[in-house]
């Protein structure tokens, strides 16, 4: 071992020598693929979609999640499974920890180069996060609000308006300003893909309403926080007090509705929603899909949410992307007036990055970082290090109906045949193929897929999936058909 290598291991940890970031990322991807296969797409998306690798050494794995609730849920329900999967990946692993990411943004996990000692970045523990969370909640109560803390950056003033979000913004302002007309679209349901500004808009409503209402009876909650508070209240025999707090409000704002899980929790939320709407209290909800597609939700909740107005925020156009970059530059220059980025560069990034606002933010942060040690960045160089973003647009979600149409057209049957009880060979095979593709290409659960295929049981869907999986190994014609259908469905959804 060289002197440099000795220093690397010594500085990292004698007990847990650090593995390179590339190795860690590859191992994490393999374990996550195994996890998804075991728990299913829906459970994986709900509970592990925001799981990140924080640290990976020879004997220790640290995974991070954004909330204490997620940490607790994963530890209680999937802790043993995670540990077993990591031990299958690396038999030397002794411990797998799930920690909570801090409120403040931190750099990525440990990086270990050949000629540089690794820096183990500080992560907040669950206990420190809970202390921080409690502090924020106390401040919220003093300001007239309890629940998830608000980010001071998320205001109407900092929200970039454009054609893709103008209607949603107008509705949000109307609610925040207390216009009587707002009750006409109650509840307001805002849906959009990741990174398009849902959370920003919801927190802007809460912040503006808090300033206007005296006393302020406004509650902003993520669905996860609602679940955690409800579970904690039941555990502490304080459910009645919790319900009373929620019912004595003027404005309820719920974010990430797609994560609301559990029959008893959904039942309680349904009662709360009915009570507030029947009392002409304003409700605002956001999710990553429209109410009709939240199939894990109780039918009564979905029905009530569909009774208001659902507005979609779409991906930003060029003008919006450019304005986001200009605003981001102004904020950065307030911290460091030596930062100089030409408008030509901002225009180039706005033209080439076609994804979400989060992609824009990521590109700008990359640019700032590179500029700190590469003073003269050409457009070619920028395109080089932003390549993973410049060619990534937000792909449209594939729907089961689109799969059914494509399969019916390919096999020359009707969509109604796929949903029927007909058992002829000419219908059974296309139906099984469509169910298989629905499982592979969408995040829907087996029961949800069964309902979309004429109200079938989830075991029927599982049988179809396994049947196609068995056949495709030996049937090259079927394998080619599946690849063709996947391509046609992808083109149809693009």
UniProtKB/Swiss-Prot annotation:
One of its GO terms (molecular function) is ATP binding. Signal peptide: none annotated. GO terms for biological process: DNA replication initiation; regulation of DNA replication. Residues 1-103 are annotated as: Domain I, interacts with DnaA modulators. Coiled coil: none annotated. Residues 103-148 are annotated as: Domain II. Transmembrane segments: none annotated. Residues 149-371 are annotated as: Domain III, AAA+ region. SUPFAM superfamilies: P-loop containing nucleoside triphosphate hydrolases, TrpR-like. One of its GO terms (cellular component) is cytoplasm. Keywords: ATP-binding, Cytoplasm, DNA replication, DNA-binding, Lipid-binding, Nucleotide-binding. Residues 372-494 are annotated as: Domain IV, binds dsDNA. It is found in: Cytoplasm. It comes from the Bacteria. SMART domains: AAA, Bac_DnaA_C. Oligomerizes as a right-handed, spiral filament on DNA at oriC. Domain I is involved in oligomerization and binding regulators, domain II is flexibile and of varying length in different bacteria, domain III forms the AAA+ region, while domain IV binds dsDNA. Plays an essential role in the initiation and regulation of chromosomal replication. ATP-DnaA binds to the origin of replication (oriC) to initiate formation of the DNA replication initiation complex once per cell cycle. Binds the DnaA box (a 9 base pair repeat at the origin) and separates the double-stranded (ds)DNA. Forms a right-handed helical filament on oriC DNA; dsDNA binds to the exterior of the filament while single-stranded (ss)DNA is stabiized in the filament's interior. This is Chromosomal replication initiator protein DnaA. The lineage of its organism: Bacteria, Pseudomonadati, Pseudomonadota, Alphaproteobacteria, Hyphomicrobiales.
């Amino acid at each position: 071992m060289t002197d440099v290598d000795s220093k690397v291991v010594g500085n990292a940890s004698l007990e847990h020598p650090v593995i390179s970031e590339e190795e860690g990322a590859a191992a994490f991807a393999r374990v996550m693929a195994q996890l998804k296969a075991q728990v299913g797409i829906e459970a994986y998306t709900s509970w592990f979609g925001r799981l990140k690798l924080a640290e990976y050494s020879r004997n220790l794995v640290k995974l991070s999640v954004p909330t204490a609730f997620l940490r607790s849920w994963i530890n209680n329900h999937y802790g043993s499974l995670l540990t077993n999967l990591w031990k299958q990946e690396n038999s030397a692993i002794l411990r797998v920890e799930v920690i909570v990411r801090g409120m403040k943004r931190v750099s990525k996990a440990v990086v270990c180069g050949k000629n540089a000692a690794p820096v183990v970045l500080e992560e907040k523990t669950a206990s420190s996060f809970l202390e921080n969370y409690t502090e924020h909640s106390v401040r919220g109560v003093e300001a007239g609000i309890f629940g998830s803390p608000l980010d001071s950056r998320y205001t109407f003033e900092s929200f970039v308006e454009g054609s893709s979000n103008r209607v949603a913004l107008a509705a949000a302002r109307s609610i925040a300003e207390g216009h009587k007309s707002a009750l006409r679209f109650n509840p307001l349901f805002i849906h959009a893909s990741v990174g398009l500004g849902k959370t920003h808009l919801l927190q802007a409503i809460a912040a503006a309403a808090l300033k206007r209402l005296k006393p302020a009876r406004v509650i902003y909650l993520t669905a996860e926080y609602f679940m955690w508070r409800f579970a904690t209240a039941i555990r502490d025999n304080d459910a009645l007090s919790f319900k009373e707090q929620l019912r004595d409000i003027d404005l309820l704002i719920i974010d990430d509705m797609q994560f609301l899980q559990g029959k008893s929790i959904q039942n309680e939320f349904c009662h709360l929603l009915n009570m507030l709407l029947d009392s002409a209290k304003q409700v605002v909800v956001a999710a990553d899909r429209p109410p009709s597609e939240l199939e894990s939700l109780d039918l009564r909740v979905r029905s009530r949410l569909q009774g208001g107005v659902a507005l979609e925020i779409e991906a930003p156009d060029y003008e919006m992307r450019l304005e986001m970059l200009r605003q981001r530059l102004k904020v950065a220059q307030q911290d460091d007036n030596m930062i100089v980025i030409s408008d030509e560069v901002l225009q180039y990034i706005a033209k080439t990055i076609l994804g979400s606002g989060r992609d824009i933010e990521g590109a700008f942060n990359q640019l700032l970082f590179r500029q700190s040690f590469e003073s003269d960045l050409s457009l070619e160089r920028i395109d080089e290090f932003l390549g993973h973003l410049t060619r990534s647009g937000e792909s449209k979600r594939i729907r089961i109906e689109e799969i059914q149409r494509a399969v019916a057209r390919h096999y020359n049957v009707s969509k109604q045949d796929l949903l029927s009880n007909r058992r002829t060979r000419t219908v059974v095979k296309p139906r099984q193929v469509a169910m298989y593709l629905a499982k592979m290409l969408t995040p829907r659960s087996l029961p949800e897929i069964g309902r979309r295929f004429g109200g079938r049981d989830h075991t029927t869907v599982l049988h179809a999936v396994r049947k196609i999986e068995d056949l495709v190994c030996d049937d090259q014609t079927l394998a080619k058909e599946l690849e063709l259908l996947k391509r046609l469905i992808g083109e149809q959804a693009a």
